[in-house]
């Protein structure tokens, strides 16, 4: 148990990058000696042209796995040679449907995960597949369709021989565990009180306790047993839509959530369903149709309120609407562990200003970092929630979807417009270099070994010092 505990608590001990944001989703690597200056014509070791996709590459000792989609709408899993970037194989995934997506999402947004040999991928428009190191399909498992108007975003996670996949949607949300060698279901738990979500879970190994997986979702954080799927502890206090992946230290988990309409001061007290039925339910059928609702704001926002898409508002739709209007955005530090409902017992601090929408927080060498659209970069004391420094990343005042990562005393931040900012890490961080690509970047950079990997819309680059 100790090696796993040390891995989860101190990600710098890990030299792998086998899943979204590397060791337990931390975004932290022990890579050293990476160049501050790089670009298409500077310090590029190799470049491989690829079809687009927002997923980040993941790595085994000799291979790189990533997902993509092409102009014909085909879904791909692609394997590269880690040494020279040559394509070793590419496999097409079935696409039985073409789900509605937000313009900021893509059909290949969830990142792959690898056990060091095999690759596991998840696509919104199919479900799960596993491939061997040479591209042979090991198994496939159709999942969905998903009632998520933005498309899915959470990546699969491995815990020993268990493959974990969260599937949060407007209705029918669930969390499931599968055997990584067969795809056979180990357990599945329904999440009826959860709407759409995009956050990738993280693992938690308490001293002397069983391995857990922590899942942020609408309004609450839940820790499940990896072995059984049983809820071990949970706490309320999150916003209604979670996109970033949390980060952890030994004692706390830092959960970021921002959703439109839930900034401080925007909360509303909405009447219970039973009360509005008495005055609005003209035909007395126990549901609310559009024409029965006098509030134009609800009618205008109908697609976000009618979660099950059946044309009327039922008790669940209304309760989720009430919860949504009461929710508040924030970066919250929760104390790890406990049993049962930890609401009101686990919050260490909460920060509610200048919050990113999509990028995950970064915890590196005792400092928390956030990057927000417009290039607003913030360092925070993880002990207190106090802002240490906040300023714009001059030269990269842009939209941000990729998450910050760190290695070798540097923090790397990539903007949608193709700017990659290199910062000197620290409470009073400094911008060292702004590197530019003539291409969009949605994928999170990977600092690994003696290379920095950058995926743009059309290529994967490996940078290093000659």
Which stretches of residues belong to each language-model region?
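Noncatalytic, solvent-exposed loop/strand surfaces
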Residues: 14-466
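Bacterial N-terminal signal peptides
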Residues: 1-11
């Amino acid at each position: 148990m100790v090696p796993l505990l040390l891995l989860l608590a101190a990600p710098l001990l890990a030299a792998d990058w086998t899943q979204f944001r590397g060791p337990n989703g931390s975004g932290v690597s022990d890579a050293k000696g990476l160049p501050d200056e790089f670009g298409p014509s500077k310090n590029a070791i190799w470049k491989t042209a690829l079809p687009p996709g927002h997923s980040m590459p993941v790595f085994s000792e000799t291979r790189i796995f990533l997902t993509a989609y092409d102009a014909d709408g085909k879904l791909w899993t692609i394997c590269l040679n880690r040494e020279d970037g040559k394509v070793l194989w590419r496999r097409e995934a079935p696409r039985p449907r073409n789900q509605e997506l937000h313009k900021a999402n893509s059909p290949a947004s969830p990142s792959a995960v690898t056990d060091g040999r095999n690759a596991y991928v998840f696509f919104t428009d199919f479900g799960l597949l596993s491939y061997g190191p040479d591209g042979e399909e090991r198994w496939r498992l159709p999942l969905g369709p998903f009632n998520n108007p933005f498309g899915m975003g959470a990546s699969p996670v491995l815990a020993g021989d268990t493959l974990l996949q969260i599937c949060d949607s407007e209705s029918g949300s669930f969390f499931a565990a599968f055997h990584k060698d067969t795809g056979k279901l180990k357990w599945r738990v329904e999440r009826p009180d959860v709407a759409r979500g995009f956050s990738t879970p993280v693992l938690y190994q308490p001293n002397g306790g069983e391995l857990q997986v922590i899942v942020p979702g609408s309004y609450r954080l839940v820790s499940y047993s990896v072995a059984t799927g049983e809820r071990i502890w949970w706490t309320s206090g999150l916003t209604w839509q979670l996109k970033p992946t949390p980060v952890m230290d030994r004692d706390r988990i830092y959960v970021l959530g921002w959703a439109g309409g839930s900034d401080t001061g925007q909360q509303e007290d909405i009447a219970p369903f039973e009360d509005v039925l008495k005055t609005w339910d003209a035909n007395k059928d126990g549901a609310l149709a559009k024409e029965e609702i006098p509030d134009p704001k609800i009618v205008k926002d109908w697609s976000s309120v009618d979660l099950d898409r059946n044309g009327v508002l039922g008790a669940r739709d209304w309760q989720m609407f009430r919860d949504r209007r009461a929710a508040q955005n924030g970066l919250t530090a929760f104390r790890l562990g406990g049993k049962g409902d930890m609401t009101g017992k686990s919050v260490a601090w909460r920060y509610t200003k200048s919050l990113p929408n999509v990028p995950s927080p970064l915890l590196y060498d005792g400092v928390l970092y956030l990057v927000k659209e417009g290039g607003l970069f913030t360092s925070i004391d993880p002990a207190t929630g106090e802002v240490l420094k906040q300023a714009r990343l001059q030269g990269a005042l842009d939209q941000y979807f990729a998450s910050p990562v760190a290695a070798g005393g540097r923090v790397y931040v990539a903007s949608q417009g193709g700017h990659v900012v290199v910062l000197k890490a620290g409470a009073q961080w400094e911008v060292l270099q702004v590197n530019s690509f003539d291409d969009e970047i949605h994928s999170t950079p990977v600092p690994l070994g003696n290379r920095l990997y950058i995926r743009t819309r059309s290529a994967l680059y490996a940078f290093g010092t000659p």
